[in-house]
Amino acid sequence: MAMYQNMLVVIDPNQDDQPALRRAVYLHQRIGGKIKAFLPIYDFSYEMTTLLSPDERTAMRQGVISQRTAWIREQAKYYLEAGVPIEIKVVWHNRPFEAIIQEVIAGSHDLVLKMAHQHDRLEAVIFTPTDWHLLRKCPSPVWMVKDQPWPEGGKALVAVNLASEEPYHNALNEKLVKETLQLAEQVNHTEVHLVGAYPVTPINIAIELPEFDPSVYNDAIRGQHLLAMKALRQKFSIDEKVTHVEKGLPEEVIPDLAEHLQAGIVVLGTVGRTGLSAAFLGNTAEQVIDHLRCDLLVIKPDEYQTPVELDDEDD
């Protein structure tokens, strides 16, 4: 079954070029599916005009929405004329990430694509507050698209958590690998690599416990990770030569390997916590993301529930 048949593209209101829309069309050409070009807009000055009646205010809002809709249609003109099914929707909402997630839920969208900004071609991608909210709270996978052509023969790198005792991490690892393999097969037979990072010995342990042998500890940790990686790759018949178990912090290991492999995309799982720790995707994931220079696909566990609710007035 083809994946991602109902894509939501978040339009960037500040530029004519729309890399996320381009990537969605690229996917559509290979796996089919519908595309919705979506833009939440809000202008505080329109809310401040107390001299206007509610009807006049609504008409002004509607005027802005119509202008923006026509502008997006112009950006998508080439694709629309080529027969790509793109629906355009502009909404008035003062919290873009909520508008996007509400649209994902209401429209049952199975993938969100959004452009990631960067200072220049060499630097890491910069994530806005809206990006972070989406990565943490969007129930569907979120694909952050870099404003660069896909590298020739660009690979997909799946970051897996091999250390966890928690059963949900195994399920999430398997989901990441399965979905990436499926996507790679359907899109352009992309080579898929797996990476797991394992920690180095904490120096303070070696100092506090003179009889402690760091090399034995390191070997044991590496051995555990290698066994976990072997079990995972064998489940999916993945060749050992495209799996990587590296010593170091994930936020260093994963971006470095992505660059070394010239990966087009890194795929990460996030547990997406709510409540007190809602500010974190999991520190590790956030730090990895901050160091990346390629596209990013963030996938949540099956049981993830977003804290964002539909507005009552949503139809």
Swiss-Prot record:
Alphabetical list of Pfam families matching this protein: Usp (PF00582)
- GO cellular component terms listed in the entry, alphabetical order: cytoplasm
| Protein name per the record | Universal stress protein E
Please give the SUPFAM superfamilies that the UniProt record associates with this protein. Adenine nucleotide alpha hydrolases-like
Function recorded in the entry: Required for resistance to DNA-damaging agents.
What the record says about family reads:
Belongs to the universal stress protein A family.
Cellular compartments annotated: Cytoplasm
Return the CDD domains for the record: USP-E_repeat1 (cd23943), USP-E_repeat2 (cd23660)
The source organism is Salmonella typhimurium (strain LT2 / SGSC1412 / ATCC 700720)
**Per the record's keyword annotation, is Cytoplasm included, yes or no?**
yes
**PANTHER family given for it?**
UNIVERSAL STRESS PROTEIN E (PTHR47892:SF1)
Task: Tell me which InterPro entries the record gives.
Answer: UspA
Key words of the record? Cytoplasm
